[in-house]
């Protein structure tokens, strides 16, 4: 057997092969773990529907141990907020009055660092989300929304 590089002995070649190949195999395997999408991954398109609501519930369960029911619905939110959120196209229950609020929003407020979290989605909730993602706060979730898309991307890191 002749070697192209005369400075590389058979022993060095075998040693390099024995170390290099398994290491490459481990790297190849681990790179698929990093790039593989989760079965629970959601579309990061900037539009909020029931898929995003369910993803948010899973996210709150994962990062805060919220133990939320994953039903894909942000329940009982005051309807006056809906016109400020055209990027929300589903997965929300808007009610004209007597809203009870949502446990999901309570945990979102906790996650965003509110001292006194509530169950109601308000202008301040949007502003906190926008600030969290480094987006200039305008207290709106237009569609498609950079804020919604940033949230969807973060959800996908955890679910």
Which stretches of residues belong to each language-model region?
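Cell-envelope/ECM-targeting effectors and their regulatory/trafficking segments
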Residues: 2-159
